[in-house]
């Protein structure tokens, strides 16, 4: 007589060090193998979209910092660009260059944090994380110079910036650009050919091309599955069409490819930054924008390529100083929706390696 067995339901979280926020995973196990997964989120819901509809357009900028708080600069950019499009505000050329510089620095800083935490989840405790935070600290110091903040920068404004970059910013940035490629080489020497990392990541947590498209995956997760899609190239915004850079694409869609895409993207960000610093013009940093903004009635959707993927803002104006509708398209939520396709069939021991490779920030998921 065959022995009857039952699947085991295991809850991970909502307070777990590898979820990087309050988030619960409800997984169904057949022995050690995952047969089903349900992500349970909402623990960090703050009602940001509804709160934003009760405040002026300017007062809503700090809300964007608190979505993906590891990508605050790009969040600022996505939102102010949507409002500028809605209100017909022109941004000076110098301000556009500064925005590209800050966006690419933010991309590198976000990837450094994401990769450090990912390797921590793999079991490489502390050492790779501290190596990567060593370089991230230099970027945070640059952000501190221009915004006065190390987190939640609130630096962008409609039409540009209130304050120009301080004079010590560019010399410090040039030093960083000279040294950062060598440190990325160091990361690769330590990690990319490490036997344990390869065993834990190669062929693990594969997201197939069609599933990546069907789940609306974004950013490095999408490109690791072989989809050549990056808003900077496919729907250029700001002045990205002036720069030469490549879009890293992988083909296997596994945990290793998602790691490698971020390594390659940091190299391309350095390439963009060097061009932007070289071509940075003099001039105004603030376009003509009223202090109390009342965009004409209408609606707009604007998107950028953030560190985690396509970040979009949908705004509806009724002609007053407050938005009638304020909606975020968060890449972290979309990437999280693809998690089940990645983990089913793998052992529970592989779960955190796969989850860490999609680099989720719950502030953006729950909003």
From Swiss-Prot:
It is a peripheral membrane protein. Its main location: membrane. Keywords: Cell membrane, Membrane, NAD, Quinone, Translocase, Transport, Ubiquinone. One of its GO terms (molecular function) is NAD binding. Pfam families: Complex1_49kDa. Transmembrane segments: none annotated. It is found in: Cell membrane. InterPro entries: NADH_Q_OxRdtase_suD, NADH_UbQ_OxRdtase_49kDa_CS, NDH1_su_D/H, NiFe-Hase_large. The keyword Metal-binding does not apply. Signal peptide: none annotated. It catalyses: a quinone + NADH + 5 H(+)(in) = a quinol + NAD(+) + 4 H(+)(out). The keyword rRNA processing does not apply. GO terms for cellular component: plasma membrane. Its EC number is 7.1.1.-. Coiled coil: none annotated. NDH-1 shuttles electrons from NADH, via FMN and iron-sulfur (Fe-S) centers, to quinones in the respiratory chain. The immediate electron acceptor for the enzyme in this species is believed to be ubiquinone. Couples the redox reaction to proton translocation (for every two electrons transferred, four hydrogen ions are translocated across the cytoplasmic membrane), and thus conserves the redox energy in a proton gradient. NDH-1 is composed of 14 different subunits. Subunits NuoB, C, D, E, F, and G constitute the peripheral sector of the complex. Belongs to the complex I 49 kDa subunit family. This is NADH-quinone oxidoreductase subunit D. It comes from Dehalococcoides mccartyi (strain ATCC BAA-2100 / JCM 16839 / KCTC 5957 / BAV1).
């Amino acid at each position: 007589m065959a022995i009857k067995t039952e699947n085991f339901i295991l809850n991970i979280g909502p307070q777990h060090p590898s979820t990087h926020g309050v988030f619960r995973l409800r997984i169904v196990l057949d022995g050690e193998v995952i047969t089903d997964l349900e992500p349970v989120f909402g623990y960090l819901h703050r009602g940001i979209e509804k709160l934003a509809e009760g405040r002026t357009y300017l007062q809503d900028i700090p809300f964007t910092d608190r979505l993906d708080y590891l990508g605050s600069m790009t969040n600022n950019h996505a939102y102010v660009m949507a409002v500028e499009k809605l209100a017909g505000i022109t941004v000076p050329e110098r301000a556009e260059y500064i925005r590209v510089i800050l966006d690419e620095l933010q991309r590198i800083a976000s990837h450094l944090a994401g990769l450090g935490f990912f390797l921590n989840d793999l079991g490489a405790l502390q050492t790779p994380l501290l190596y990567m935070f060593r370089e991230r600290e230099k970027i945070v110091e640059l952000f501190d110079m221009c915004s006065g903040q190390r987190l939640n920068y609130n630096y962008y404004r409609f039409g540009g910036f209130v304050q120009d970059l301080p004079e010590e910013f560019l010399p410090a940035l040039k030093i960083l650009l000279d040294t950062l490629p060598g440190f990325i080489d160091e990361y690769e020497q330590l990690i990319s050919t490490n036997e344990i990392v390869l065993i834990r990541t190669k062929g693990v947590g594969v997201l197939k091309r069609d599933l990546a498209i069907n789940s609306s995956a974004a950013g490095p997760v999408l490109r690791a599955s072989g989809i050549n899609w990056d808003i900077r190239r496919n729907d250029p915004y700001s002045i990205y069409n002036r720069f030469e850079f490549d879009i890293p694409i992988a083909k296997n869609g596994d945990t290793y490819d998602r790691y490698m895409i971020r390594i390659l993207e940091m190299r391309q960000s350095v390439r963009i930054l060097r061009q932007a610093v070289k071509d940075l013009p003099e001039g105004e940093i603030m376009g003509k924008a009223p202090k109390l903004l009342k965009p004409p009635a209408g609606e707009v959707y604007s998107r950028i390529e953030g560190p985690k993927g396509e970040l979009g803002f949908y705004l509806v104006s009724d002609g007053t100083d407050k938005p009638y509708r304020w909606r975020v398209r968060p890449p972290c939520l979309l990437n999280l929706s693809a998690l089940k396709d990645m983990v089913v069939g793998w052992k529970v021991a592989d779960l955190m390696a796969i989850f860490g490779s999609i680099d989720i920030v719950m502030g953006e998921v729950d909003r």
